[in-house]
Amino acid sequence: MKIIQEIPERNIIKLIPENLDDLWHLSHIIQPYNAIYAVTERRTEDKGDKLRADRGTKRRVFLGIKAEKINFHEDFNRLRVSGKIIHAPDDIPIGSYHTIDIEPFLQVSVQKNWKKWDIERLKEAEDSSKKPKVVVVIMDDSEADIFLVREFGIKELASIKSGVSKKLDYKQNEQAKFSYYSDIINSISEFEGKILFAGPGFGRNNIQNYISEKYKSLAPNVVVESANHTGKSGLSEILKSGIIDKIYGEARISKETQVVEKLLEEISKKGLAAYGIESVNNAMNFSAIDTLLLTDEYLRRNRRSVENLMNSVENINGNIIIVSTEHDAGKQLKALGGISALLRFPIE
């Protein structure tokens, strides 16, 4: 994310999203009734062309709309914001509806009552764009699962079988193994950034040696760590361990996973935790909240009612973490009601 300009007297921030992660952040920053300004395509009636008067022609115009619907489309790499037009050229009626498709590298101006957590989220998105992307390969000698670590969750890129078998002789197994390594490398070679190989056994070390010999330009990006499990269980183990943070410089998804894990640990021992809106509000009455955790879904559905609570947490110097429901930790928090808190001291 690039923050181009801040205009505090008008509550406007001009910015440029640079990738899918930035669009996801924006989908949680832009709320109904916010004003969005951008260059967009609009079909307008061409009164001088009778043949096309029924459809009009598309042209690029600078419009402002008051947001009503905000939809993040991961598969199409865009964020769609729909609402009534509040600023337009003279030939486009104010109050008519329009949808602005926000895509990477489109400059957008957002006008809203900016909260502290909105600004923090923008700054976080700006910082994350400077960090290397991380691909995680959870593997052993028989299978590899490949994942891309994003700000809002994990994307599974591929699942590859080795073809190694006890039924094959040594030479055939060696051929199958090298073919397996080649398939893995072909699946990750287009991604810039760090590549973490993890899993039980020696598969991770063997492929590191193979890359050092055959793909020397890729070798400096390779990191190897042990894990007790394969597949998604192995990925969960890696996220909880903090290894991603060492590579990435604190990945959002790793941070969220670790804080939810801490919450579950406190709940299991009836320690410094509260979950559910009633329990959390009660903790706030005692100024006991150290860290407030909300899922993005909960905040979206209850923003107006929960903003007072968030402001109160900030007033006692508490932390606020908004957790994505696109990964397992977010789903666990959702199962607890979507809102929880880590406490400074126990309360009755």
Swiss-Prot record:
Molecular function via GO: endonuclease activity; metal ion binding
EC number: 3.1.-.-
SUPFAM superfamilies linked: Dom34/Pelota N-terminal domain-like, L30e-like, Translational machinery components
The protein's required cofactors: a divalent metal cation
Gene3D superfamilies xrefs: 3.30.1330.30, eRF1 domain 2, Pelota, domain A
GO biological process, one term: nonfunctional rRNA decay
Compartments (UniProt record): Cytoplasm
Pfam families in the cross-refs: eRF1_1, eRF1_3
Swiss-Prot/TrEMBL keywords: Cytoplasm, Endonuclease, Hydrolase, Metal-binding, Nuclease
Chief place where the protein resides: cytoplasm
GO cellular component terms attached to this protein's record: cytoplasm
Iron listed as a keyword: no
NCBIfam families: pelota
Biological role stated in the UniProt entry: May function in recognizing stalled ribosomes, interact with stem-loop structures in stalled mRNA molecules, and effect endonucleolytic cleavage of the mRNA. May play a role in the release non-functional ribosomes and degradation of damaged mRNAs. Has endoribonuclease activity.
Subunit structure, interactors included: Monomer.
Domain notes: The N-terminal domain has the RNA-binding Sm fold. It harbors the endoribonuclease activity.
Similarity comment text for this entry: Belongs to the eukaryotic release factor 1 family. Pelota subfamily.
Name used for this protein in its record: Protein pelota homolog
Gene transcribed to yield this protein: pelA
